[in-house]
């Protein structure tokens, strides 16, 4: 089994995140879901972003590090939207990380360099990305494509899956952007990715 840490979006640790964790557990994996927002959850992205801004990226980064401090080295990091930033950072910077699942976007390595001091993608660490084709929050050519180049350049597998529509958080069953068909397909792909990592 793979051991996975899932970081929530700016909406907080909502039932959709916990349900996703249960789905991965049912597939045989160990899953951790840190709460970075002190139990607060939000119904709109604007309200969630206000919480994110009130904490600041340094504090959120500190909380993510604290959340994984007692966990073993061989982790897969996953994240929804805001959470993918920290999942990607920890995958690139924490020794022994086995992979990243980035839902609803990606950050180019240059962005990790600017904010976290990460200079390159670790050798052999695979990445899977999921986002909607017309998501206004995702700039694929500036974010997803260069990350893919960096991951492949480090000798690792890079998968980017594009889904129909413009919903940013299309995998959250309690959010208005939910797309059941896309969500189900995404989770099938995530489970397959984790199974491949587990089989290595």
Q: Where are the language model's segments positioned?
A:
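Serine-hydrolase catalytic machinery in alpha/beta-hydrolase-like enzymes
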Residues: 1-74, 171
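Active-site signature of alpha/beta-hydrolase-fold catalytic machinery across serine-
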Residues: 19, 89-93
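Short beta-strand immediately N-terminal to the catalytic nucleophile in serine-hydrolase-like folds
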Residues: 77-79, 103
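Gly/Ala-rich beta-loop-alpha elbow adjacent to hydrolase catalytic centers
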Residues: 79-83, 87
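A conserved short beta-strand
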Residues: 96-108, 126
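Short beta-strand/loop motif that positions the catalytic acidic residue
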Residues: 123, 129-131
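Conserved alpha/beta-hydrolase "acid-adjacent" motif
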Residues: 136-143
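C-terminal catalytic histidine-bearing segment of alpha/beta-hydrolase fold enzymes
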Residues: 157-200
């Amino acid at each position: 089994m793979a051991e996975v840490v899932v970081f929530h979006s700016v909406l907080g640790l909502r039932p959709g995140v916990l349900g996703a964790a249960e789905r991965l557990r049912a597939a045989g994996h160990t899953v951790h879901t840190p709460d970075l927002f002190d139990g607060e959850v939000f119904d709109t992205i604007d309200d969630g972003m206000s919480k994110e801004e009130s904490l600041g990226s340094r504090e959120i980064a500190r909380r993510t590090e604290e959340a994984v401090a007692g966990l073993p080295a061989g982790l897969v990091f996953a994240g929804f939207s805001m959470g993918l930033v920290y999942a990607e950072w920890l995958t690139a910077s924490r020794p022994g990380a086995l992979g990243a699942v980035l839902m609803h976007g990606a950050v180019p390595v240059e962005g990790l360099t600017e904010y976290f001091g990460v200079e390159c993608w670790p050798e052999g660490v695979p990445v899977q990305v999921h986002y909607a084709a017309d998501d206004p929050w995702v700039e694929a050519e500036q974010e997803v494509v260069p990350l893919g180049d960096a991951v492949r350049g480090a000798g690792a597998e890079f998968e980017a899956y594009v889904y129909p529509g413009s919903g940013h958080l299309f995998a959250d069953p309690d959010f208005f952007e939910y797309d059941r068909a896309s969500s189900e397909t995404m989770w099938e792909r995530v489970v397959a990715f984790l199974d491949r990592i587990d089989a290595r």
